[in-house]
């Protein structure tokens, strides 16, 4: 784990320099497991992100913007009651562990002095953010409640006494004595795994880097390793407070550990936050897809069962033709089938006359023929629904936080979700704008099916070129105000269509290109569904860096 005690040691120094003595002005909880504090310190405004996420747990200053819930939850309200307007008196790391404490002082509604500690524990799935009364060490509230049935050693509930996580009895590498350190370095194996067991707060990467430093002059190099000044750095798979042996040579320069984390988590945390916000929608779409796929299998089986319709008609025809050869008192008859040149055995109802038996087969044939027509229509409708839901599923997988609400609105309008009590109608956004590589042509991209419909049938002019990944879910893309785009611009548009499709990560994607005037929306068609003929097909390989560089 990159955010280990060693990294937190360096981060604590950064936070102290920027935040100690500062005043907490605003408190928000944009996501289920993350808190953002707006702090004014040294005539500057800072945003402090506290995350109790099981994978991305961390503490950092951030430049990122967040959308906050319209109605704050209980934890946010309690934090505001105790911390809004509070002064941060001290920021302290517990030894070299992944626990950070913010000691604050404030006054309550009647002017009495309040002292509290906001504790951030970064411990994987057990990560937590806990507000504690400093005088009594009682828990006021926590972002995650832990009852006795979950953890008999320490409950994390309002009113419980705060107990620190169990001690591991490992040594703090910053305060261990020279005598003890000499004994360990002289007698113990210095493998990364053993270093993690002996010394507190070392993640796997840090322990591996330390082991490399201890190949010669162990005591001197041990102290030198932990005395190094902070140099924020990316590693081959993560990040570190210092350049490690596996740090890439060419990488951006980071002014602070916080800017390093903003860079590293900008996509990873965003995708996870989208997943949190979109969880209900993803589950609903997955459920509807499963239901419709099962329905399609059943309908296709029923259609297969109607394949006897032609044989039923032939039996009626043969009974009519050879009526005089059909007995009245037998359960079957064998007649020459002039359709095949072979004899055909035909079952009879002994309670009916030969003529009535023939009519019985004709009536059965008519029912089967009507069933074929009905089932064919149902199958087409079910297939259309599956295609639509797959497109929504694709867009949910690629959506930003800002786009989730609009996809939710789409699912409400199409009847897959009900509007929540007092939920307002979400204002529809316009398709996204991208600048082609010629530096002047604007390309529009629909980011959901409502935007796709608006772009294709309301915004696109007749002669403008329209693009869509071939035969797979994806965005509608239109080159605007350029009726004769260059091949380079066409490629740009095709790459956008490929990137914003189910084939985003494919090496070669087929993309259809056609004039917008040749597009047709069938009556009753689902949002985003179009038909067309006469298209040309391009083959492109989209790259994320190019797409991001085109975004306006």
Curated annotation (Swiss-Prot):
A Pfam family recorded for this sequence: NFACT-R_1
Record-level GO cellular component terms: RQC complex
Keyword list, A-Z: Cell adhesion, Coiled coil, Protein biosynthesis, RNA-binding, rRNA-binding, tRNA-binding
Keyword Nucleotidyltransferase found: no
Phenotype of the disrupted gene, per the record: About 25% decreased adherence to human HEp-2 cells, about 50% decrease in binding to immobilized fibronectin. HEp-2 cells treated with mutant bacteria secrete less IL-6 and IL-8, activate ERK and p38 more slowly and to a lesser extent than with wild-type bacteria.
Function: Key component of the ribosome quality control system (RQC), a ribosome-associated complex that mediates the extraction of incompletely synthesized nascent chains from stalled ribosomes and their subsequent degradation. RqcH recruits Ala-charged tRNA, and with RqcP directs the elongation of stalled nascent chains on 50S ribosomal subunits, leading to non-templated C-terminal alanine extensions (Ala tail). The Ala tail promotes nascent chain degradation. May add between 1 and at least 8 Ala residues. Binds to stalled 50S ribosomal subunits.
Record family assignment: Belongs to the NEMF family.
Protein name: Rqc2 homolog RqcH
């Amino acid at each position: 784990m990159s955010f280990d005690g060693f990294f937190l040691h360096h981060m604590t120094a950064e936070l102290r320099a920027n935040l100690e003595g500062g005043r907490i002005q605003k408190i928000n909880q944009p996501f289920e497991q993350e808190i953002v504090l707006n702090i004014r310190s040294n005539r500057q405004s800072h945003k402090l992100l506290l995350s109790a996420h099981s994978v991305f747990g961390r503490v950092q200053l951030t430049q990122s913007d967040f959308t906050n819930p319209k109605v704050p939850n209980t934890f946010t309200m309690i934090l505001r009651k105790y911390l809004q307007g509070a002064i941060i008196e001290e920021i302290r790391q517990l030894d070299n562990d992944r626990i950070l404490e913010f000691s604050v002082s404030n006054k309550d509604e009647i002017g009495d002095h309040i002292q509290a500690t906001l504790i951030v524990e970064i411990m994987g799935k057990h990560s937590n953010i806990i507000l504690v009364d400093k005088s009594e060490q009682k828990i006021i509230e926590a972002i995650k409640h832990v009852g006795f049935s979950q953890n008999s050693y320490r409950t994390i509930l309002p009113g419980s006494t705060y107990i620190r996580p169990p001690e591991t009895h490992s040594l703090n590498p910053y305060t261990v004595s020279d005598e003890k350190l000499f004994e360990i370095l002289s007698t113990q194996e210095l493998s990364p795994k053993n270093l993690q067991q002996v010394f507190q707060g070392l993640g796997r990467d840090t322990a591996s880097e330390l082991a490399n430093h201890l190949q010669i002059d162990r005591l001197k190099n041990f102290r030198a390793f932990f005395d190094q000044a902070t140099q924020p750095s990316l590693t081959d798979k993560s990040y570190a407070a210092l350049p490690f042996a596996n740090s890439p040579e060419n990488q951006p320069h980071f002014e602070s550990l916080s800017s390093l984390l903003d860079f590293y988590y900008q996509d990873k945390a965003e995708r996870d936050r989208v997943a949190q916000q979109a969880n209900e929608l993803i589950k609903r779409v997955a459920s509807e897809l499963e239901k419709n796929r099962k329905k399609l299998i059943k309908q296709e089986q029923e259609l297969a069962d109607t394949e006897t319709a032609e044989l039923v008609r032939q039996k009626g025809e043969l009974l009519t033709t050879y009526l005089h050869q059909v007995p009245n008192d037998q359960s079957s008859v064998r007649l020459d089938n002039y359709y095949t040149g072979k004899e055909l055995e035909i079952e009879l109802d002994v309670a009916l006359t030969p003529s009535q038996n023939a009519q019985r087969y004709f009536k059965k044939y008519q029912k089967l023929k009507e069933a074929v027509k009905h089932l064919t229509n149902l199958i087409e409708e079910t297939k259309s629904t599956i295609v639509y839901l797959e497109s929504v599923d694709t867009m949910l997988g690629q959506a930003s936080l800002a786009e989730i609400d609009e996809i939710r609105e789409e699912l409400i309008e199409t009847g897959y979700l009900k509007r929540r009590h007092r939920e307002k109608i979400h204002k529809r956004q316009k398709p996204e704008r991208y600048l082609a590589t010629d530096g002047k042509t604007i390309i529009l991209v629909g980011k959901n099916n409502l935007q796709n419909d608006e772009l294709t049938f309301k915004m696109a002019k007749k002669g403008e070129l329209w693009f869509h990944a071939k035969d797979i879910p994806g965005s509608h893309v239109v080159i605007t105000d350029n009726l004769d785009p260059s091949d380079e611009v066409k490629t740009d548009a095709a790459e956008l269509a490929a990137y914003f499709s189910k084939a985003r990560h494919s090496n070669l994607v087929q993309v259809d290109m056609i004039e917008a005037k040749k597009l047709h929306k069938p009556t009753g068609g689902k949002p985003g569904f179009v038909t067309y003929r006469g298209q040309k097909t391009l083959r492109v390989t989209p790259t994320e860096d190019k797409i991001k560089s085109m975004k306006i």
